[in-house]
Amino acid sequence: MANSPHGGVLKDLLARDAPRHDQLAAEAESLPAIVLSERQLCDLELIMNGGFSPLEGFMNQKDFDGVCENCRLADGNLFSMPITLDASQQVINELKLQAGSRVTLRDFRDDRNLAILTIDDIYRADKEKEAKLVFGGDPEHPAIKYLNTKVEEFYIGGKIEAVNKLNHYDYVALRYTPAELRIHFDKLGWSRVVAFQTRNPMHRAHRELTVRAARARAANVLIHPVVGLTKPGDIDHFTRVRAYQALLPRYPNGMAVLGLLGLAMRMGGPREAIWHAIIRKNHGATHFIVGRDHAGPGKNSKGEEFYGPYDAQHAVEKYKDELGIEVVEFQQVTYLPDTDEYKPKDEVPAGVKTLDISGTELRNRLRTGAHIPEWFSYPEVVKILRESSPPRHTQGFTVFLTGYQNSGKDAIARALQVTLNQQGGRAVSLLLGDTVRHELSSELGFSREDRHTNIQRIAFVASELTKAGAAVIAAPIAPYEHSRKAAREAVSQHGSFFLVHVNTPLEYCEKTDKRGIYAKARAGEIKGFTGVDDPYEAPENAHLTVDVSKQSVRSIVHEIILLLETEGFFDRA
C-alpha cells in the first residue's frame, strides 16, 4: 500500500471539482483572468493534482510568513517552499482584484481556463525575507535572481477550484498524477517504493545506486525526473526522457517505473530537499534518495557553493518523523575496472584502482566527440545524448558585436560573414543594427526601454538560429550592459555566445562619419544619440576588444576566427 499523503488527505482538486465542471467552466468565462507564466503553470498543476498537498491554492500571507520563517503553514503542517501567485499593481488595478474576488487562472499557451481562484488576500511580496530565509540571501542564487528580475510586487493568496487540467503533448503516458501513480503501485503490488529525483541523464552509476537502495529495503524504484523548469543550461527534458526510457530495460524486470514530474525547481538546496520529499510522499513513495548538495545550484561567481554538501540531507533528516518518508542518503559509487563493478566509495579498500568521469568531463567528451566508455554509460544512452549534443564543430554560435555608431561593426560583420561562408559547414545569418531596426523594430524609438526591447528581439532571433546550428553575427550598438547580459543569457541556453567590443574611439567614429549623423546629433536634430547625449556602457566581460582606428578589418576578423577555432567550432579532422 502506498504511503499516506502529507497532511493525511490527498488534495486532488481535479477529482474533487469534476462534478461541478460545467458550472465552474461557465463561471470562468465570465470572470477577469490572470494569464499564468510557465512557472506559475507548473505550480498550479501540482496544486490541482495534489502533488503539493496539503495546499489547496496559492499561499496567503499567513502561510507565506510561516513557511519563510519556520517551514510551517498557518495550520501547523510542515512545508518548506513558498508557493505564491505574483501579480503587478497594474494587473490588480485593471482587474479590480481584492479580497473576496474570484478570478480565472488561464494558460498562456492555449488560452484555456484552468482554475478559479477565490482571493483570500493581496499582499506585498517580501522578496528580501524570501531571499534570505528560504534561499540563503546570496544575490547570485538563481531563485533570488528570479525573485528580483521576474517576480511582480504583489502576491495573491487564495484557494483554487479546478476547471481543466493542463494539456501536455509530450510523454503523456508517463505524466502520472499522484492518484494515478498510487493506483499504479497498487496494481503492481508495490508496498515499498524508493523515489529517485534527477534533472540530469542517468548512467550506470545511477542505475547501480538505485538498485542498491531498493535491494537493501526490499523495495521497488520510482525514477521521478523533473521535466518542468530546471537549471538554465540543463539538458532538455526531451533528450533526458528518451535516455531514461533507454535505461529502464537495464533494471531487473519489474523493479522500476518511470514517471515524470512537471515541477518548477527553485534550486533551493535544504529547503528544496524537504519539498521534494513531501512531493514524493504525495505520489506514494515510502523512501526518497537525497544526494550530496541535493537541488543545489552549483557555485557562485567566486567559486563558492551556495550550500554545504550535506545540508540537504541534514534538513530532511531533521524532519524525517514528521515527513513520514524514509530518507535514503545518496551513496557516491565508483567503478572498479579490475572486477567490472560499482561500489560505494567508502567500501573500496585502499590501493584498489577506481575510475570516474565527472559531469564536466562528460560534457567535454560529448562536445568533442571523444569516446565515452561502456563502464560509465550504456551505449544506447550515449547514442541519445550524442544526437542531442553534436560535436562543437557542428553547433551554432553567436558573435555579438557592440560599439558606437560608425565604429566599424558593420564592416567587421560583413567581412566575418564572407569568411564563415567560405569556411562552410553551417548557415550564416547577419543581423545588422539598421536592418533589424527596419525589419523587426520599426515601431520602437530610442528610449532606454525601447533600446532594451530591440536588443532582446535580436537575442531571441539569434538564440533560435543558434539552436538550429547556424552561425549568427549580430552588430547592434547595444549601449547598455544589462541588455547585453540578457542577450548573452538568452543565446547561451542554446549555444555559445561571443561578445566582441568594437572599442573604436568616439572621436574617430565622429571624424569618419560620412553620413553626418553625429553632426545632426550635435546640432540637436537627433535626440538620445549614443555618445552624444546618451551614454555607452563599456562591456565588463568581452571575449575580444578591437579597435578599427588601430587595426584593419581583416586582422580583426582573423582574431575572431582564431577565437572560434580555439573553441572548436571548425572541423579539425
Swiss-Prot record:
<dbReference type="InterPro" id="IPR014729">
    <property type="entry name" value="Rossmann-like_a/b/a_fold"/>
</dbReference>
<dbReference type="InterPro" id="IPR002650">
    <property type="entry name" value="Sulphate_adenylyltransferase"/>
</dbReference>
<feature type="region of interest" description="Allosteric regulation domain; adenylyl-sulfate kinase-like">
    <location>
        <begin position="395"/>
        <end position="573"/>
    </location>
</feature>
<feature type="binding site">
    <location>
        <position position="333"/>
    </location>
    <ligand>
        <name>ATP</name>
    </ligand>
</feature>
<feature type="active site">
    <location>
        <position position="198"/>
    </location>
</feature>
<keyword id="KW-0486">Methionine biosynthesis</keyword>
<keyword id="KW-0963">Cytoplasm</keyword>
<dbReference type="GO" id="GO:0005524">
    <property type="term" value="F:ATP binding"/>
</dbReference>
<feature type="active site">
    <location>
        <position position="199"/>
    </location>
</feature>
<feature type="site" description="Transition state stabilizer">
    <location>
        <position position="203"/>
    </location>
</feature>
<dbReference type="Pfam" id="PF14306">
    <property type="entry name" value="PUA_2"/>
</dbReference>
<feature type="region of interest" description="N-terminal">
    <location>
        <begin position="1"/>
        <end position="169"/>
    </location>
</feature>
<feature type="binding site">
    <location>
        <position position="295"/>
    </location>
    <ligand>
        <name>sulfate</name>
    </ligand>
</feature>
<keyword id="KW-0198">Cysteine biosynthesis</keyword>
<comment type="pathway">
    <text>Sulfur metabolism; hydrogen sulfide biosynthesis; sulfite from sulfate: step 1/3.</text>
</comment>
<feature type="site" description="Induces change in substrate recognition on ATP binding">
    <location>
        <position position="330"/>
    </location>
</feature>
<feature type="binding site">
    <location>
        <position position="197"/>
    </location>
    <ligand>
        <name>sulfate</name>
    </ligand>
</feature>
<dbReference type="GO" id="GO:0070814">
    <property type="term" value="P:hydrogen sulfide biosynthetic process"/>
</dbReference>
<dbReference type="GO" id="GO:0010134">
    <property type="term" value="P:sulfate assimilation via adenylyl sulfate reduction"/>
</dbReference>
<feature type="binding site">
    <location>
        <begin position="197"/>
        <end position="200"/>
    </location>
    <ligand>
        <name>ATP</name>
    </ligand>
</feature>
<comment type="function">
    <text>Catalyzes the first intracellular reaction of sulfate assimilation, forming adenosine-5'-phosphosulfate (APS) from inorganic sulfate and ATP. Plays an important role in sulfate activation as a component of the biosynthesis pathway of sulfur-containing amino acids.</text>
</comment>
<feature type="active site">
    <location>
        <position position="200"/>
    </location>
</feature>
<dbReference type="Pfam" id="PF01583">
    <property type="entry name" value="APS_kinase"/>
</dbReference>
<keyword id="KW-0547">Nucleotide-binding</keyword>
<dbReference type="GO" id="GO:0004020">
    <property type="term" value="F:adenylylsulfate kinase activity"/>
</dbReference>
<dbReference type="InterPro" id="IPR027535">
    <property type="entry name" value="Sulf_adenylyltr_euk"/>
</dbReference>
<comment type="similarity">
    <text>In the N-terminal section; belongs to the sulfate adenylyltransferase family.</text>
</comment>
<comment type="subunit">
    <text>Homohexamer. Dimer of trimers.</text>
</comment>
<keyword id="KW-0021">Allosteric enzyme</keyword>
<feature type="region of interest" description="Catalytic">
    <location>
        <begin position="170"/>
        <end position="394"/>
    </location>
</feature>
<dbReference type="InterPro" id="IPR050512">
    <property type="entry name" value="Sulf_AdTrans/APS_kinase"/>
</dbReference>
<keyword id="KW-0067">ATP-binding</keyword>
<comment type="similarity">
    <text>In the C-terminal section; belongs to the APS kinase family.</text>
</comment>
<dbReference type="GO" id="GO:0019379">
    <property type="term" value="P:sulfate assimilation, phosphoadenylyl sulfate reduction by phosphoadenylyl-sulfate reductase (thioredoxin)"/>
</dbReference>
<protein>
    <recommendedName>
        <fullName>Sulfate adenylyltransferase</fullName>
        <ecNumber>2.7.7.4</ecNumber>
    </recommendedName>
</protein>
<dbReference type="GO" id="GO:0005737">
    <property type="term" value="C:cytoplasm"/>
</dbReference>
<keyword id="KW-0548">Nucleotidyltransferase</keyword>
<feature type="binding site">
    <location>
        <position position="199"/>
    </location>
    <ligand>
        <name>sulfate</name>
    </ligand>
</feature>
<dbReference type="InterPro" id="IPR027417">
    <property type="entry name" value="P-loop_NTPase"/>
</dbReference>
<feature type="binding site">
    <location>
        <begin position="291"/>
        <end position="294"/>
    </location>
    <ligand>
        <name>ATP</name>
    </ligand>
</feature>
<dbReference type="InterPro" id="IPR024951">
    <property type="entry name" value="Sulfurylase_cat_dom"/>
</dbReference>
<dbReference type="GO" id="GO:0009086">
    <property type="term" value="P:methionine biosynthetic process"/>
</dbReference>
